């Protein structure tokens, strides 16, 4: 029983480490996208945002992806593009 608990704790620690890495990657991408958007002229920025949103709409996944997941992705993309980090 102790071995099982120890193994579960090790797996939990590994998952937590993977989660931290993913959070760091997402934050890094947010910083890069924000910096790129700030360097663009307003008209170019709006054109890029519209293009990305249109492509995202065209690539909307089929029934194999839960609607909630698809909507969450769209919300995060819209938030990143329309309300970038400070």
Swiss-Prot record:
GO terms classed as biological process: cellular response to starvation
Name the UniProt record assigns to this protein: Anti-adapter protein IraP
A Pfam family that the UniProt record links to this protein: Anti-adapt_IraP
UniProt record similarity statement: Belongs to the IraP family.
Lineage of origin: Bacteria, Pseudomonadati, Pseudomonadota, Gammaproteobacteria, Enterobacterales
rRNA processing in keyword set: no
Organism: Enterobacter sp. (strain 638)
Subunit structure: Interacts with RssB.
Role, per record: Inhibits RpoS proteolysis by regulating RssB activity, thereby increasing the stability of the sigma stress factor RpoS especially during phosphate starvation, but also in stationary phase and during nitrogen starvation. Its effect on RpoS stability is due to its interaction with RssB, which probably blocks the interaction of RssB with RpoS, and the consequent delivery of the RssB-RpoS complex to the ClpXP protein degradation pathway.
Coiled coil: 1-42
Transmembrane segments: none
